[in-house]
């Protein structure tokens, strides 16, 4: 007969349960009620200047997020620069890239007792790159070269995006502690707001932002010119090179809690067996910032460059135009498909052609691949850069909204932050025969279905209608051109049927 469990152990379990319940307690809510702050604190990159980061819940999407608080001691100085602070966060809210931790929302909380900015960011639960590398080394495993290339490509994709903004966004705090890796291999860069906070805040508000370098153990991630007036995007390239070196060797040994020495970095460089990888990393770590390549050029280095497969190109094309297709298009197409039919064939000089049939395609693997491409794990790099994001972008609220901004907990602006993944519309004559009745269905990326109806004249512009939907917060700014083209095509087809 088993002995009864000791009472102290049961007591410890009850204590752990109580602690877990305490951590899930809701301490505070956002003004709109969507974000709920919990007691549990999280570490998402040791962001200097952020006094507290808590786990929070997004009650609309049912996912965990991070609740960040930036505190200001001088209440009067904060009030004097409130507009500049809002503009700074509006700029950050525009930064949208699959390999960058997303800033979802922000608001100001200014009372007689305190002044703070609260902003909600994406939560990456799988941990930092440094934690992953330590775990890999502890398990006596070597770094897979293919994984190294994939991670470098994703990090450079994010840096190329930031540096292509106008003006360029310099990360300024890129280390293996501020790079996160998800369970599916997706890389996310955090603390993008570090440099903007350090440089954009006025001198009298600079006190909560520690502009000095990170703790000693991370000093080796920063180049010699770091902190100088004229430093630029090359700062991030040096930091990336050190991250790439650490990923390749798993760990650069430090002397206890002190900084990593030049000798340790040299030993790590010499341990690289691949000459292309060594040359790639050394070009990033050049002492002269003018000799470091740009993030975009590094993507074309021979150690990373590869010709994209037709499968990957087709996947990106499919995802970019998925908004034109029904939600269950893949399922419907495969139902009507003859699985024994030939999908493709390759002629052989001697003998019959090599054939692939639909039955050889794993639709489950195909769905997973499409999801990975959609999430940003396989970016397209061998093409011209997309139109750069223009910053700063001044969002002028209506007068009544500007008045609200002076209240303790304002909502800065109401704009749609979710992208459209599917569009459908129907046109028919209205009862008076002079107008068209438009029914528009928009499926957003969180699967929200938004159905809109509108009576319009045949002479109305698709561009004006799309702009109006953006203005009233029904459509993301990035989807305006896409929707306008979709509506224009629909209008032309409908006019043809009425002729």
UniProtKB/Swiss-Prot annotation:
<feature type="modified residue" description="Phosphothreonine">
    <location>
        <position position="409"/>
    </location>
</feature>
<dbReference type="GO" id="GO:0016242">
    <property type="term" value="P:negative regulation of macroautophagy"/>
</dbReference>
<dbReference type="GO" id="GO:0030182">
    <property type="term" value="P:neuron differentiation"/>
</dbReference>
<dbReference type="GO" id="GO:0043524">
    <property type="term" value="P:negative regulation of neuron apoptotic process"/>
</dbReference>
<feature type="modified residue" description="Phosphothreonine">
    <location>
        <position position="407"/>
    </location>
</feature>
<dbReference type="GO" id="GO:0005524">
    <property type="term" value="F:ATP binding"/>
</dbReference>
<comment type="function">
    <text>May regulate apoptosis of neural progenitor cells during their differentiation.</text>
</comment>
<comment type="similarity">
    <text>Belongs to the protein kinase superfamily. Ser/Thr protein kinase family.</text>
</comment>
<keyword id="KW-0963">Cytoplasm</keyword>
<keyword id="KW-0524">Neurogenesis</keyword>
<dbReference type="InterPro" id="IPR042697">
    <property type="entry name" value="NRBP2_PK"/>
</dbReference>
<dbReference type="GO" id="GO:0005737">
    <property type="term" value="C:cytoplasm"/>
</dbReference>
<feature type="region of interest" description="Disordered">
    <location>
        <begin position="396"/>
        <end position="416"/>
    </location>
</feature>
<feature type="region of interest" description="Disordered">
    <location>
        <begin position="1"/>
        <end position="31"/>
    </location>
</feature>
<keyword id="KW-0597">Phosphoprotein</keyword>
<protein>
    <recommendedName>
        <fullName>Nuclear receptor-binding protein 2</fullName>
    </recommendedName>
</protein>
<dbReference type="InterPro" id="IPR000719">
    <property type="entry name" value="Prot_kinase_dom"/>
</dbReference>
<dbReference type="GO" id="GO:0004672">
    <property type="term" value="F:protein kinase activity"/>
</dbReference>
<dbReference type="InterPro" id="IPR050588">
    <property type="entry name" value="WNK_Ser-Thr_kinase"/>
</dbReference>
<feature type="compositionally biased region" description="Acidic residues">
    <location>
        <begin position="18"/>
        <end position="28"/>
    </location>
</feature>
<dbReference type="InterPro" id="IPR011009">
    <property type="entry name" value="Kinase-like_dom_sf"/>
</dbReference>
<dbReference type="Pfam" id="PF00069">
    <property type="entry name" value="Pkinase"/>
</dbReference>
<feature type="domain" description="Protein kinase">
    <location>
        <begin position="36"/>
        <end position="304"/>
    </location>
</feature>
<feature type="compositionally biased region" description="Basic and acidic residues">
    <location>
        <begin position="7"/>
        <end position="17"/>
    </location>
</feature>
């Amino acid at each position: 007969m088993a002995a009864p469990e000791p009472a102290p152990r049961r007591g410890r379990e009850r204590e752990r349960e109580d602690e877990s319940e305490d951590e899930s307690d809701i301490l505070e809510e956002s003004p709109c009620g969507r974000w709920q702050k919990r007691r549990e604190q999280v570490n998402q990159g040791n962001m200097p200047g952020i006094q507290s980061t808590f786990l929070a819940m997004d009650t609309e999407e049912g996912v965990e997020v991070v609740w960040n608080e930036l505190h200001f001691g001088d209440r009067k100085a904060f009030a004097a620069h409130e507009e500049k602070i809002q503009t700074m966060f509006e700029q950050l809210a525009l930064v949208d890239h699959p390999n960058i931790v997303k800033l979802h929302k922000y608001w100001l909380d200014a009372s007689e007792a305190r002044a703070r900015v609260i902003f909600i960011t994406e939560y990456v639960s799988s941990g930092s790159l440094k934690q992953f590398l330590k775990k890999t080394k502890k398990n006596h495993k070597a770094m897979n070269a293919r994984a190294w290339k994939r991670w470098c490509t994703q990090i450079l994709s994010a840096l190329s995006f930031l540096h292509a903004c106008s003006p360029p966004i310099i990360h300024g705090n890129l280390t293996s502690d501020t790079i996160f890796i998800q369970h599916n291999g997706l890389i996310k860069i955090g603390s993008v707001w570090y440099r903007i906070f350090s440089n954009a805040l006025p001198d009298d508000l600079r006190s909560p932002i520690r502009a000095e370098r990170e703790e000693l153990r991370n000093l080796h991630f920063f180049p010699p010119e770091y902190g100088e007036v004229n430093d630029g995007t090359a700062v991030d390239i040096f930091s990336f090179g050190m991250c790439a070196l650490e990923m390749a060797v798993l760990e650069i040994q430090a002397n206890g809690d002190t900084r990593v020495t030049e000798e340790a970095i040299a030993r790590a460089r010499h341990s690289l067996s691949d000459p292309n990888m060594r040359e790639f990393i050394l070009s990033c770590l050049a002492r002269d910032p003018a000799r470091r390549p740009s993030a975009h050029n590094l993507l074309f280095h021979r150690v990373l460059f590869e010709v994209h497969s037709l499968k990957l190109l087709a996947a990106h094309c499919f995802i970019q135009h998925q908004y034109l297709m029904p939600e269950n298009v893949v399922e419907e197409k495969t139902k009507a498909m003859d699985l024994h039919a030939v999908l493709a064939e390759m002629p052989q000089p001697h003998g019959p052609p090599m054939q692939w049939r639909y039955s050889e395609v794993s639709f489950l693997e195909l769905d997973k691949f499409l999801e990975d491409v959609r999430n940003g794990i396989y970016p397209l790099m061998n093409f011209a850069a997309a139109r750069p994001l223009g910053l700063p972008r001044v969002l002028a609220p209506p007068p009544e909204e500007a008045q609200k901004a002076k209240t303790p907990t304002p909502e800065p602006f109401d704009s749609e932050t979710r992208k459209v993944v599917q569009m459908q519309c129907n046109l028919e004559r209205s009862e008076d025969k002079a107008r068209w009745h438009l029914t528009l269905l928009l499926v957003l990326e969180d699967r929200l279905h938004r159905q809109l109806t509108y009576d319009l004249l045949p002479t109305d512009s698709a561009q004006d209608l799309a702009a109006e939907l953006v203005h009233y917060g029904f459509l993301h700014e990035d989807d305006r051109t896409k929707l306008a083209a979709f509506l224009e095509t629909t209008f032309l087809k409908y006019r043809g049927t009425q002729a």
